[in-house]
Structure formats: C-alpha cells, structure tokens
Amino acid sequence: MPRLGAHLSIAGGLPRAVDRAKASRCQALQIFTKSAGQWRARALPPEEIALFRAQVERTGIHPVVAHNSYLINLAAAAPALRAQSLAALGEELDRAESLGLQGLVMHPGSYTSGTEDDGLRLIGDGLAALLAERPLGRTMVLLEHTAGQGTNLGHRFEHLAEILERVDGSPRVGVCLDTCHLLAAGYDLCSDDGYEHTFHELDRIVGLDRVKVFHLNDSKKPCGSRVDRHEHIGKGCLGLEPFRRLLNDPRFAGLPMLLETPKLETPASKRRSDVDPWDARNLRTLRALIRTP
C-alpha cells in the first residue's frame, strides 16, 4: 500500500508540521523548510532540529520530504539570478539534510533565453556541481515533472532523462510525479490504455525506479492544457479512476503519495484544529479507493 500524506504548514515551527500530520492521520509528509516566496531563510536552531527529528521518530511518519522555494530557477541564463538560485538550492539541500529528510522536491526551472536544450544543460550542470560539493549527502534531489506552463522545463519525460544524464545518473537524484501536471502536460491517465502507455514511456525513458514520490492532485484543466491548476480529488478532469489505478498499482506500493490540493483558507484566530477539513476529506476519498487484500 502507498503511504498517504499531504503538504502541511510549518507555522509555529517545523515540529508543528509533524503534529498536524499526526492529527490528519498522515503516514508521510511534505513541508517547506522556509518561506517559499523569499530568498532568505532564518537559521534553524539546533533545538528545533532535534525536536523535529524526535517528533518524526516518535510518530513514525515517513518519509518526510521538503519542497524548494518557487523563486529558484537553475535554468536562468542571467548570471546573477543563476548564482542566487544555486546558492539558495544549496542552502535548502543543507537544511533538508540537517533535518534528516529523504528528499528535496524541486521544479527544474524555466529557460529565460536560448533553447530548451540550453536550459536543461544549465539545470543539469548546476545540480551536478551542488552534489559534487556535498559528496556525503544523503538527502535526494527529486525532480518534479511539471505541467509545462510558459517556458517551464520538466514537462516531458525526455527533459528529466536529459537532466539525469548530466548528473551521470547519480543515485542521489530521483523523480517526483504530480498527477495534475502529468495530465496538463498531455499524458493521458484517464483511460486504461493511456495510463499503461504513460508509465511504459516513463520506464523506457527515465526508469520507474527513479520515482520516489507522487503528488496526488486532480486538475481543473484538461489533458494537454499545460496549465497547472490543482483541484480536489475526484472533482476535476482526472476523476477518481486514475487515482484508483495508481493507489493499487503494485509498481508503486510503499511510495509516499502526498496531497497538494487546495486548503480551506481559515484565519489563524478561527482555527480550532490542526486538521484542514479539505485535507481530511481528500485523504478519506483516497483511502476508500485502496483495495484491501
């Protein structure tokens, strides 16, 4: 069976995210280790790191992964932005390492000049340099397959394969698949044939063994739209059947499958629970789709 979970808030400190995950009956967890909309990050106090790791151990929630800042763009051609992006990603990788996280999910980037190939080269070379600077690192970099908005890279399996080739197939680089992004990028998950063809192609081009995490999101937009708009499970263009197939696919048994669906926007002063009602509803929907042995 997959390990279900969600992306949860770190408001109040990193250990509070683990509290929220436990209250929400999550088996796995994704967090930001800093504000996703800022370059700078506060230093993590040793006592907060220790408490977070103890909370994870105590609750048995695993794996825990982080998602990187949306500002980072390794495909940027401008030297200043590229240098800032490399430094920021390196810092986030170090933070994830200190917290004992399995992986750091990252959007590959958007090329700002030149061609797709130029952008993929910059991403791959940048990642290779960051990994070489951290030869003893254990936290994986997880390339997230994207919807392909604008000049975003990573929406074709071939893009991921090219980046992996540029890091010499490092075992420290894996893949995160997002169901909304797959559909938006043109991969048909809605029919039996489309589902099987999608994962056959992924295996042929990238390798199923590279897949370490799934993001489970329905899509507000149809197949091939290349528009990234997440929707609640079963309420969008995917419907329930693709999730039923995925949750019961033995090739992905045991992998974390994490919600990034919309939250109920409730002011902090009015919150009475660590459990987001929409997360709870979406998790119940997913659990009901899992076939019991």
Question: How would you describe each model-predicted region?
Answer:
Residues 21, 67, 85, 96, ...:
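Conserved, mostly hydrophobic/aromatic
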Residues 17-20, 48-55, 88-95, 119-130, ...:
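A general structural detector for well-ordered alpha-helical segments in enzyme core domains, enriched
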Residues 161-293:
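Histidine-acidic metal/acid-base catalytic patches
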Residues 19-26, 44-65, 92-100, 128-138, ...:
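Acidic (Asp/Glu)-rich catalytic clusters
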Residues 1-68, 72-93, 289-293:
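N-terminal pre-domain/capping segments
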Residues 74-174:
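Active-site acidic/histidine proton-transfer and metal-coordination neighborhood
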Residues 40-48, 76-88, 114-125, 151-159, ...:
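Alpha-helix N-cap and loop-to-helix initiation/capping positions
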Residues 7-11, 32-36, 68-71, 109-111, ...:
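Active-site beta-loop-alpha junctions enriched in small/polar residues
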